[in-house]
Amino acid sequence: MNTVTMKNVEFGAGVPKICVPICGKTKEDVLEQAKIILDTPADIIEWRMDWFEQVENTASVVEMAKELREVFKETPVLATFRSKKEGGELEVSTEYYVELNCAVAKSRYVDAVDVELYTGDKEVETIVTTAHENGVKVIMSNHDFFKTPSKEEIISRLCAMQEKGADIPKIAVMPQSKKDVLTLLSATNEMVEEHADRPIITMSMAATGIISRLAGEVFGSCLTFGAAKKASAPGQMGVNDLKTVLETLHKSL
């Protein structure tokens, strides 16, 4: 299993890393949330571009990314435009989604971009190539806010991301039962043991899936999400509580 390094943060080794989202609408909101996060044990920041009111202007987005880079000099920044169909705030055309992600990657103000697996094969390839040409990592993702697919389907999607050049494949699914949480954990374990040659991120959402956000070191997920102020998905814990639990588990493993 290869690890992935952004700044001085190594993903896929030791305690799962903590990602804290920024979901500000205005430039002031974004910077205010950024300053709050500076005082937390966040390992990486996710800037949710789909929340940003100027997201349909690439120049404004790149300028905002530059300001975030100035705040987070040593902390990796992941830029994410989450589509409406996968739980995001805004829908844009596929063409603009590609343009936006490529512009942010070319700016080199971020360390990684999130690319949704089902954007389209050609479009995914364009963003992945552009990101890698500019030294930017790709977290490729898929989110199902309605159900938990079968173990085989979860593994299939993660393998597809790996084949398409993801530095870190990611899947988040919604449990309808505790058994669904076990399905996600079992898929994670099998993916890591039999298929993955790089770190992966998996989670079962909402309160039912909370154990999946805490047990990454046991089953093989390299990253978990915690909230400093505003949670970006159901089931996110506060970042300080999350850090305490992850460190406590680590000591016992």
Give, region by region, the residue ranges found by the protein language model.
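Active-site beta->alpha loop and helix N-cap motifs at the rims of alpha/beta catalytic domains
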Residues: 2-4, 12-133, 146-147
